[in-house]
Amino acid sequence: MRILKPYLRSTSIQCYLCLLLNSHFLTEACIPVFILSCINAGLPKTEANWQDVISDLKIIDKIIQSLHIDATLYTESDVHPNCKVTAMKCFLLELHVISLESKNETIHQTVENIIILANSGLSSNRNITETGCKECEELEEKNIKEFLQSFVHIVQMFINTS
């Protein structure tokens, strides 16, 4: 089971930097910069890949169907675009309930993966203050199937704005 999605950073900047240093400085000065640039280019970078979140939600949906869990979860079914970060945080909190109710290791790992990916994507929106949004406890309680459908809908909102 995958936990993070590593991506390589663009190496073009490092190559241009090395060429610049090679043409203007001594070779000895360029070698450490070149080595560090190569290391930096190969380091994994975690980015929210919202398509992977949707795939993981589908995995949970398939497993849930075979387990027959009757939990109801706070679900935002009509997310306003100005409240999508708040709604996403509520969905992520409710995912823990699915993990606890199912007592299934695959679901637990998939939930953890979704949380890591989504929080990575939300990191640029952490300081955004959304006003007029419902608190998690004010949302309507719905079954897991409807919860997952609404979750996919909000993830698609993030895909459409990225």
Curated annotation (Swiss-Prot):
Protein's cellular compartments: Secreted
Q: Which GO terms describe its molecular function?
A: cytokine activity; cytokine receptor binding
The biological process GO terms on file are: immune response; interleukin-15-mediated signaling pathway; neutrophil activation; positive regulation of cytokine production; positive regulation of immune response; positive regulation of peptidyl-tyrosine phosphorylation; positive regulation of phagocytosis; positive regulation of T cell proliferation
- Do you know which Gene3D superfamilies this protein is assigned to? Interleukin-15/Interleukin-21
Listed under GO cellular component are: extracellular space
One Pfam family named in its UniProt record: IL15
Q: What does this chain do? A: Cytokine that plays a major role in the development of inflammatory and protective immune responses to microbial invaders and parasites by modulating immune cells of both the innate and adaptive immune systems. Stimulates the proliferation of natural killer cells, T-cells and B-cells and promotes the secretion of several cytokines. In monocytes, induces the production of IL8 and monocyte chemotactic protein 1/CCL2, two chemokines that attract neutrophils and monocytes respectively to sites of infection.
Q: Could you say which protein family the record assigns here?
A: Belongs to the IL-15/IL-21 family.
Q: What is this protein called?
A: Interleukin-15
Originating gene: IL15
